[in-house]
C-alpha cells in the first residue's frame, strides 16, 4: 500500500505535463494571433470612438455610402462567437460571412487573402479565446440601391479577388519575403496606397503609387526616388513606421497616424526592417508632375518677422504671413524651422508641403495631428473652428510658396470640400444609370426577338 502511494506524485506529474504543455501551446498561439491582429490593425475599424475593442460600430465613409463595422468579439449573440474556423477564414480571406452573405471590400479581404492557413488558425485562436466578448450589436449597414444587394459582390470578387495565399519567392531572402508577406497581407498597405478604378478595385498597374483615403491622400510608397520613397534609407523607413515621423522628410497624419499608433509601432524591429526592405524594391511609379523629390522643397523664411502689422478688420483679408504668425509660428517658429529635434517639424523639406496633391496639407490644418510613441505623444491642434476656408487657403498657399513646392496650390473650394468630408461620389448614380441601360437593352432584345418570331409565324401561315 505504501509503495503504491509513493507513485502517486509521479503519476500526477505525468498527467499534468501534457495539460501544461497544451496550455503553453494555446497561450503561444493566442499571442501569435494577437500580434497578427495588431499587424492587421483590426482594432482601427472594428472599434468605435470610446467603444470596447473589436465591438464594431465605427462608421466608415465610402464612395457608395457609410459602412458600419461589425462586432468581431467572440460574443455568441452579437459577434463571431458561433463561427467555425472555416467560416472565420472565409470571412477573412474571401469576404463571405457565416450566413453566406458577402462583405464589402471596405474590409480588406482582398489583402487578407494572402494570409497563410497557419496564421488564420492563430488569428482564430486569439479572437475566440483572447478577446473579451461584447454582447452589443452595432447598427446594420444600409447602403443605397444597388449596392445594398450584397450578392453583387460575388461578381466583383470574380473580377478582382485573388484568393491565393502568399507564396514566398525563392529568389529572394527570408527578410524580403517576410516584409512582402506583411505588407501585402496583414498590414494591407495597398488598400490605401494604391489608386482605384471606377469599380473601386485596386489598379494593379499602379500598385502603391498613391491613392485617396477619404479626405486624405495616401502617398506613393514605391521605390521611385522623386515621387516615392526611393531616396529614403531603410533606417529612415523603419523610424517612420515605428515613430511616425522622420525629421526633414515626413510625419504621419490622419489614417497613417492611426496605423502607426494602433499597429506599426508595436511590430518587432525585425518585421519593420523586413517591410522596409520589401518597400525599397517595389517597382517605381513616377508622377510626371514631380520634378524633384517631394521632401526636398523649400528652406527657412523670415517673412513672418515682417508680418506683425495692423490686422485688417475682415479676418479673411489677412495675408498668409499674418495667418502664419498668428496661428503657426509659435510652434513651427518664425522661419518655419520647427524645434525639439523634429518633434515640432520644419515646414520645409517636408512631404506635406512638397507634394502637388495638397489634400494632406489642408487636412493637417483642419484636423491637426495626433500620434503616440512608447514614451510620449505628439499633438498638433486642428484649426477647423478657428480659421475660415479662405484663411486656410491663404496660409496654405503661403506655406507652399515659402516652404514647399511653389507649383502646388490650395483653393477655397478645395478647403470647403475637404471640410465637408470630401467630394460627393457619383458611383451610386452611375450604377443606377448602368442598370437602366442594361434593362432597356434587354427589353429591346426581347422585343426584337418577339417581333421576329411573330413575323416568322405570319410567313408560315
Segments predicted by a language model, with ranges:
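Sequence/structural segment immediately N-terminal to covalent heme-attachment motifs in c-type
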Residues: 27-48, 53-61, 153-157, 167-197, ...
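Post-cleavage N-terminal segment of exported redox proteins
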Residues: 1-28, 67-70, 91, 96-99, ...
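C-terminal cell-surface addressing/anchoring modules of secreted/extracellular proteins
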Residues: 422-438
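Axial heme c-ligation environment in periplasmic c-type cytochrome domains
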Residues: 66-82, 93-118, 138-143, 218-229, ...
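Extended intrinsically disordered, low-complexity coil regions enriched in Ser, Thr, Gly, Ala
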Residues: 82-87, 97-104, 195-201, 209-213, ...
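C-type cytochrome heme c attachment motif
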Residues: 35-47, 70-71, 87-94, 105, ...
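Active-site substrate-binding loop specific to GH73 endo-beta-N-acetylglucosaminidase modules
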Residues: 55-65, 195-244
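Sec/Tat-exported extracytoplasmic proteins
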Residues: 40-41, 46-49, 76, 92-100, ...
